[in-house]
Swiss-Prot record:
It is found in: Membrane. Probable lipid hydrolase. It is an enzyme of class 3 (hydrolase). A motif (GXSXG) lies at residues 311-315. Keywords: Hydrolase, Lipid degradation, Lipid metabolism, Membrane, Transmembrane, Transmembrane helix. This is Patatin-like phospholipase domain-containing protein AN0408. GO terms for molecular function: triacylglycerol lipase activity. SUPFAM superfamilies: FabD/lysophospholipase-like (SSF52151). It comes from the Eukaryota. It comes from Emericella nidulans (strain FGSC A4 / ATCC 38163 / CBS 112.46 / NRRL 194 / M139). Residues 1-21, 630-659 are annotated as: Disordered. Its EC number is 3.1.1.-.
Length: 749
């Protein structure tokens, strides 16, 4: 019987190994408030068929009963319907022709992938290299996997590639020269520290200048994924030595006594802004999302789990579990026994079939709310989760109104929003779960509808991977995407290899399946993408359930590092079924093994990022040392301001004037900062919201810094509003003059 990794006698398949297994976190009053919010409807105006018929009385005229069901079906509005004889005559024939051609291309694509698979099995993977490759899949521990990967690299000659500095996809001359300069200056600083000298600052300033010049995202191409796609383990020795040297230099600046604390703080703040942050993005995919548990487990065990996590649809449930638990709790939870708490699809066919016929949704919203609350630790809000774990949880939600903007719920945009309601909204796929109301926690702890009671649905329908929103709010420019959407996984193919998955024949310079196989695959996939865009731009696609379904194909689904857990055919059969402990164990193992090839790339990125954060947390802007506390994603105090603190946000004041009862019921506490961040892009991003429904916290500004720049808070907020207005004008004008996909998160299949 399998035991836990800690070495104790706890069975990983037993419910007793799950902490808080029998704990009911959700307050029944919260569930009743949610039920009331779902059933409450705005008052309907008094209407009648004409002046002499009763109000609200349904009177069916002769001949109208036959068209009743057809009239209720969602359709395009009059403004969206294109007029003209040719459009009316050619719309359906052209639509049928394109759909037929897409079907033909899909069959051709499937045959091409089968050919490439057979080519690799019969030509590429033979003999000893095949036996060494099989060794990779036998290990559930990263260290053992790494030894097997190094043995395979040695056999394939990839170790020799690592020792050669030259490579077309990065500037090796700059990296080599800069690495030597950093090493020389760092050794001088260390010598002065050993001699106890603290007066000279020239050498430290030189080291700081070098770091500010090179500590940037993808400087000289060192974060190019191609550098990690030529070997199973690691990258070129020159790149690895450079990253280790930069990390050592950042640590030396942190520990040096030659520079004042306020200078160190300013230095680390600039490094943090230039280098950016890393985020883990968990895609949707129904029960395929349980592969995310294995991905998170692999990152957690190797101490490379980012502090910024976002999830959509099924991925939102996994993200909520990660965002509300500490590391120690996660290590106990991410085991096969967790399957005993996953019971969302336990109903029989007759039960859910009657519900679907009656309500249009297969699953019951209240039942899902009750079960989802355990993963979110009850009615925990986004701010409370951040204060408890230090992790920044993000959940993508799409309004049921197709014309309203999406929201990335987190502790900045919706701090008092209850997490389980956002997870339900993100999983509300039309036909599976009806749109739900987001809930917010009031000052007395009770729940009330959020955003005026508007309803929300599945975020993956429009923003499966919200890269732009993450960059706006948290300066994220390095994304780790765990992609399990079944309709996307089928089309994933990297002809030149991926991170930790190189092309093995022709010394890495070949093509998977040969050049002909890769060329045919690329052509068919790009042609499929083209015809899907044609259908969308010509407005030929119908809208089942009132949803534009082309977005589920034409988004951007990948990131800087994309993890694709390998699925099996039985996953499609169980796509809406609860996993057994044995099946969850396989998904955990597969998720871990899919993550192992990416670990070294992620480690190199986070090694520098964590060193910068450590220096940023240790010092403050006023020159005082605050100690080496645990690293939080942002250098702000987790505590909130007092309840009597007044907001200086004009949007908050306007809402309080229009809704006097609101100010006494809702608590919008504001996060205090260790210091003033007047030029912090993250602070600016908070004040860039243009929607009055989303009240974001405002932070204190450095008056001296603002005076030096020559602009105040109000002027900054206005400049950001103007920026958004200009972007919106450019996007709308692109409809007439440019390709609209240039201004959206479009992505290839």
């Amino acid at each position: 019987m399998e035991k836990s990794a800690a070495g104790d006698n706890i069975d990983k398949y037993s419910p007793s190994s799950i902490p808080d297994y029998d704990t009911e976190f959700l307050n029944p009053d919260d569930l009743r408030a949610f039920e009331k919010a779902l059933t409450d409807q705005d008052a309907d105006p008094l209407v009648a068929l004409n002046d002499w018929r009763p109000v609200y009385q349904r009177v069916v005229r002769r001949g109208r009963g036959r068209r009743k069901s057809a009239a209720a079906a969602p359709r395009r509005t009059k403004d969206e319907t294109r007029e003209g004889v040719l459009y009316t005559v050619l719309k359906w024939p052209f639509l049928l022709f394109v759909l037929g051609w897409i079907t033909f291309l899909s069959v051709g694509y499937a045959l091409t992938r089968i050919y490439i698979f057979l080519y690799e099995q019969w030509v590429t993977w033979r003999g000893k290299r095949e036996s060494l490759r099989r060794e990779l899949y036998k290990h559930e521990n990263y260290d053992d996997w790494l030894h097997a990967a190094q043995a395979l690299d040695e056999y394939l000659g990839n170790q020799r590639w690592k020792k050669i500095d030259e490579y077309a996809y990065y500037d090796h001359l700059t990296i080599r020269k800069l690495g030597r300069q950093l090493r020389t200056v760092r050794m001088q600083v260390e010598e002065e520290m050993k001699r106890g000298e603290s007066g000279s600052t020239v050498v430290v300033e030189e080291l700081c200048n070098l770091l500010e010049a090179c500590v940037k995202a993808n400087f000289a191409g060192v974060e190019n994924p191609r550098l990690y796609s030529e070997a199973y383990s690691g990258t070129k020795d020159l790149v690895q030595d450079y990253i280790d040297e930069v990390h050592a230099c950042v640590k030396v600046i942190t520990d040096s006594r030659q520079a004042r604390n306020e200078e160190k703080y300013s230095h680390f703040k600039h490094l943090d802004t230039n280098f950016g942050r890393t985020a883990l993005c968990l895609s949707g995919g129904a029960t395929f999302a349980y592969y995310h548990f294995g991905v998170v487990r692999a990152l957690l065990d190797n101490e490379v789990l980012p502090s910024i996590i976002t999830g959509t649809s099924g991925g939102a449930l996994v993200a909520a579990l990660v965002g509300t638990r500490t590391d120690d709790e996660l290590k106990q939870l991410l085991v096969p026994a967790l399957a005993h708490k996953i019971k969302a699809c336990s109903e029989g066919f007759t039960t859910w079939a009657r519900r679907w016929w009656r309500t249009g949704a297969r699953f019951d919203t209240m039942d899902w709310a009750r079960q989802c609350s355990w993963f979110c630790r009850g009615s925990t809000t986004f701010r409370e989760a951040y204060e408890r774990t230090g992790r920044i949880l993000n959940v993508s939600c799409v309004p049921s109104d197709p014309h309203s903007p999406t929201i990335l719920a987190n502790y900045l945009t919706s701090p008092n929003c209850v997490i389980w309601s956002a997870v339900l909204a993100s999983a509300a796929v039309p036909g599976i779960l009806n749109p739900v109301v987001l809930m917010t926690k009031k000052r007395d702890g009770t729940l009330a509808p959020y955003s005026f009671g508007h309803k929300w649905k599945d975020g993956s329908l429009r923003t499966d991977i919200p890269i732009k929103a993450l960059n706006l709010h948290f300066n994220v420019n390095f994304t780790i995407v765990s992609q399990v959407n079944p309709h996307i996984n089928l089309f994933f193919f990297s002809s030149r290899g991926a991170v930790g998955r190189p092309v093995t024949h022709r010394k890495g310079r070949g093509w998977r399946g040969g050049f002909l196989g890769s060329a045919i695959e690329q052509y068919i996939k790009l042609d499929l993408n083209k015809w899907l865009k044609v259908l969308r731009h010509l407005e030929l696609l119908p809208r089942p359930l009132g949803q534009d379904w082309s977005e589920i194909w034409l988004q951007k689904f990948s990131g800087t590092v994309t993890i694709w857990p390998k699925t099996v055919p039985s996953d499609f059969y169980h796509i809406l079924s609860d996993p057994s402990p044995e099946r969850l164990a396989r998904m955990l193992r597969t998720g871990q093994q899919s993550t192992f090839p990416k670990i070294q790339f992620i480690k190199n990125r986070l090694k520098i990022e964590y060193a910068i954060l450590e220096g940023l947390h240790r010092f403050s802007a006023d020159g005082e040392s605050v100690g080496a506390t645990s690293i939080q994603p942002f250098p702000f105090d987790n505590g909130a301001a007092g309840a009597d603190q007044k907001s200086n946000d004009p949007r908050e004041e306007r809402l309080n004037r229009n809704f006097p009862e609101r100010s006494s019921e809702y608590s919008y506490d504001y996060v205090k900062s260790f210091s003033d961040f007047s030029d912090d892009p993250i602070v600016s991003a908070e004040n860039s919201s243009v929607d009055d429904n989303y009240i974001v916290p405002s932070r204190q500004r450095d008056a001296g810094a603002e005076a030096g720049v020559g602009t105040g808070t109000a002027e900054r907020r206005g400049s950001f509003s103007s920026l958004f207005n200009l972007e919106e004008m450019r996007r709308q004008s692109a409809v007439f003059f440019d390709d609209p996909d240039l201004y959206r998160d479009g992505g290839d299949l």
